[in-house]
A protein has these predicted regions:
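Post-Walker A helix-loop "phosphate-sensing" segment adjacent to the P-loop in P-loop NTPases
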Residues: 8-17, 177
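Switch/connector loops and helix/strand junctions flanking conserved nucleotide-binding motifs
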Residues: 25-27, 93-95, 112-118, 163-167
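Conserved phosphate-donor/acceptor-positioning beta-strand/loop module used by diverse small-molecule
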Residues: 83-88, 97-121, 157-158
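Conserved AAA+ ATPase "sensor/coupling" helix adjacent to the nucleotide-binding pocket
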Residues: 52-56, 118-126, 170-174
Length: 199
């Protein structure tokens, strides 16, 4: 989220705010806001949107619906801005199927300890974190393994925030130049995956 928020300070980019049926959370001490962090909707609204084909992609993740609406992408297009979003690998797979020229970036921490520290900040209490840990752990393994296997992800190690922001922006604006130029990052990510598996 930090990298995306920095990119969104530029008028070139527009955030594609996803819809979700989960309740707002507190991340790093700040409550999520409707229309900014997500469009928080109930299950019936999600079902209606699905039936009316109002989502570009929608998936069930951890028992919750997450989706990107056609309306959100249309806003970016109408404003002639680069659409950016933060979605899971299932959503990216759908984007790649619908628009193969989409640019997919997988940002990972430098090690498992940093990953756990950052993940804990997403929860209000240690108890909340521990309750979600089994799902998050399994999901991290699945998603990172998948991202390392498919050819369309650019992998970035977020060990230096300013560098990670700069590289992310360069890839978004000049993606073809960077195709498969991330072997070192992929090696770090592969080691991270092995560490996470062994937690």
């Amino acid at each position: 989220d930090t990298i995306k928020k920095q990119l969104l300070k530029s008028p070139e980019f527009r955030d594609i705010v996803s819809h979700t049926t989960r309740a707002p959370r507190t991340n790093n001490g700040c409550a999520e806001q409707d229309g900014i962090d997500y469009h928080f909707i109930d299950s019936q609204t999600a079902e209606n949107m699905l039936q009316n084909n109002e989502f570009i992609e929608a998936k069930f993740v951890h028992g919750t619906v997450y989706g990107t609406s056609v309306a959100e992408l249309k806003l970016a297009h109408d404003q002639n801005r680069v659409a950016i979003t933060d979605i899971d690998v299932q959503g990216v797979e759908e984007y790649e199927r619908l628009a193969p020229d989409s640019i997919a970036i997988f940002i990972v921490p430098p090690n498992s300890q940093t990953w756990i520290e950052r993940l804990k900040k997403r929860y209000a209490t240690e108890e909340d974190f521990q309750a979600e840990w089994p799902k998050r752990h399994a999901s991290a393994i699945k998603e990172l393994a998948y991202a390392l296997e498919v050819p369309y992800y650019h992998v970035i190690i977020n060990d230096d925030l300013e560098r990670a922001i700069r590289v992310t922006e360069e890839i978004i604006l000049r993606g073809d130049v960077f195709k498969r130029q991330d072997d070192e990052a992929r090696l770090v990510a592969r080691n991270l995956l092995n560490d996470i598996i062994n937690l």
